[in-house]
A protein has these predicted regions:
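Catalytic beta-strand/loop cores that center a nucleophilic Ser/Cys/Thr
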Residues: 118-121, 128, 225, 255-379
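Extracellular/periplasmic catalytic domains that process cell-envelope and extracellular macromolecules
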Residues: 101-104, 145-148, 210-212, 337, ...
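Hydrophobic targeting/anchoring helices
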Residues: 17-121, 371
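A glycine-rich, often tryptophan-bearing local segment used as a flexible ligand/cofactor-contacting loop or short
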Residues: 166-303
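Alpha-helical scaffolding within the catalytic cores
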Residues: 91-96, 140-142, 351-355
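Sec-dependent N-terminal signal peptides
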Residues: 3-13
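Helical hinge/lid and interdomain linker segments adjacent to catalytic or ligand-binding clefts
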Residues: 19-20, 25-29, 60, 64-69, ...
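Extracellular ligand-binding/catalytic regions of CAZymes and related secreted enzymes
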Residues: 18-60, 335-416
Length: 416
């Protein structure tokens, strides 16, 4: 009998040494590349346990030598776990924590134009630095119905209203602006559409259908509000004649259909081409910014019930609860214009600004994140891209990477 017990103990110990813990608290050397390790494991059909609210949202992975080697190469902190595994599970069970099983590496697409633009894209930077695979799509691929091949779609500094980013006032004579305008017009004509705004609104509806069928959308900066505006206008001409050669619909105010937008309601559209702003959704407004400066601008994350609200809990995993603010063409969202079903996950508690939103539509979801680059407070046209090796523990960039793992989560019944 004693021999059996000893064998059993040895067996249990051997099982319990077959896990690697990737801590995501302040002890982690490179938070951003840690997400890449999780994706690396999923790509090799190895499940990952995401320990929600445990040490900043840590990862638990089977202890394979090649994963250890990859962690060392990428500079990711990891620990081999033995008998402590039971203590970890017990801690999770007794606190506002939970375990989500990640099962399959999501197929990721980034919506980005083929011609180089004079600004960076935070998500492309994050995925590249974290060594996560992605494909770049543009309008042709969307119009040719290839979105269904991807689990997750990202939109960044794009303009779905057909106003070329509302850069007319300062850049309409710039070579990059003229090239972009000509390219967009040629593409619209190729697909039999009379204007760029008509073509962009068609794109927005296809993306909405993609979400409805189970897709995951993540949008930042101007791709958030301009997208919802495009959905709400549909067949209405809401752009100035300098953009399409035709006048704005005289009854545009009464023709906005807020029921067609995803997240926002009761907003006012700014049609003046000289105003660098789409609507009053943006807070603070880009054309009249009221900022406290980089040293004083912060937003806070809400804490959700890990066992009852796993989705917003996943999307807000971090090693700090308060994050540096950052600006963009769309810096944040006016709380008064957010639909009631939308979950606010991050906000400036001292103002009407929401920074980070999540909602469901059909079988899928969307997440909106205000601002352009979490580690560049005011990212201007022509600025060099951010070097993420200098910001490898960025809390703001972590929110982006939470979103790429979200589609990999095993669905489980919601507790009641």
């Amino acid at each position: 009998m004693k021999k059996i017990i000893i064998i059993l103990i040895l067996f249990i110990n051997s099982v319990f040494t077959q896990k690697i813990l990737i801590p995501m608290d302040q002890t982690q050397n490179d938070h951003l590349k840690a997400y890449g390790i999780a994706y690396y494991a999923l790509n090799r059909n190895i499940n990952v346990e995401w320990l929600l609210n445990f040490q900043g949202g840590s990862f638990l992975i089977d202890n394979h030598s090649f994963i250890q080697a990859e962690c060392k190469i990428r500079g990711v902190t990891f620990l081999e776990i033995g008998n402590d595994l039971l203590d970890i599970y017990s801690t999770i069970e007794q606190n506002n924590m939970d375990i989500v099983i990640l099962e399959k590496a999501p197929k990721i697409a980034i919506y980005s134009p083929p011609n180089k633009q004079p600004w960076d894209d935070a998500v492309t930077l994050a995925l590249t630095y974290a060594e996560v695979e992605y494909q770049i799509l543009w309008d042709e691929e969307v119009l040719d119905n290839t979105l269904e091949n991807y689990d997750w779609l990202h939109l960044h500094h794009e303009d779905f209203t057909g106003q070329y980013g509302k850069f007319y006032r300062n850049y309409h004579n710039a070579p990059w602006y003229i090239e972009q305008k000509n390219s967009f017009e040629s593409l619209a004509k190729k697909y039999g559409m009379k204007s760029v705004h008509e073509e962009k609104k068609a794109i927005s509806r296809i993306i909405k259908n993609y979400i409805s069928n189970g897709g995951f959308l993540f949008a930042m900066c101007s791709a958030t509000d301009s997208y919802d505006i495009a959905l709400s206008l549909e067949n209405v001409d809401g752009v100035h004649s300098v953009f399409d050669g035709t006048p704005i619909d005289n009854d545009i105010v009464n023709k906005i259909d807020y029921s067609k937008s995803l997240a926002f309601k009761n907003f006012t559209i700014y049609t003046d081409p000289m105003i660098y702003e789409f609507s009053d959704i943006d807070y603070p407004p880009s054309h009249n910014p009221i900022t406290r400066g980089a040293e004083a601008d912060y937003f806070s994350l809400f804490e959700f019930s890990a066992k009852y609200d796993p989705v917003p809990t996943m999307l807000t995993q971090n090693h700090v609860p308060i994050i540096k603010g950052f600006m963009g063409q769309t810096t944040g969202f006016n709380k008064n214009m957010i639909k009631s079903h939308v979950i606010i996950m991050g906000e400036d508690p001292a103002s009407d600004q929401a920074k980070y939103l999540h909602g469901n539509f059909g079988k899928g979801t969307y997440t909106f994140y205000g601002g352009h680059d979490p580690e560049d407070y005011q990212h201007f046209v022509g600025d060099p891209p951010t070097d993420l090796s200098l910001h490898r523990n960025s809390p703001g960039y972590r929110l982006i990477l939470n979103n790429i793992l979200f589609p990999a989560a095993r669905k489980k019944e919601k507790k009641t």
